[in-house]
Amino acid sequence: MSYKGIYRPSNPKKYKGDSQNIIYRSLWERKFMNYCDLNENILEWASEEFWIPYLDPTTNRVRRYFPDFFIKYKDKDSNIRRSVIEVKPMRETLEPKATKGKSRKTMINESITYVKNQAKWKAAKEFCADRKLEFKIMTEKELGIR
């Protein structure tokens, strides 16, 4: 089930963008938004406020990838760091495996999702390296879910 809604920040000045129109597309994204909003070490944050061009290997066309988050934060040593964050289920970060009972259609769809994600993340890593940013993929493990 997909969850979508508008997040209303408690600290709108920390948000870089339109703080009245912060859209989450999953409960995991909403949880991360709440973390960014309320954590005093997060100095600034944004959600889907910029895009990165990438080559879609399934169509051989240049597409736009909108990373889930950008954060500027103070690390444990009080250094200021900047990261681009993607929130994804662990299963979408791993190469799909054929299992008993998995349909051919499901396997094809999972494979397409996987190769597109890999292309997006490769472009994001290059984009971030050029700008001295970190790129992180956060799964249910990092978000403390399940």
PLM regions with names:
Residues 1-146:
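Electrostatic, structured charged patches in enzyme active sites and in nucleic-acid/phosphate-binding
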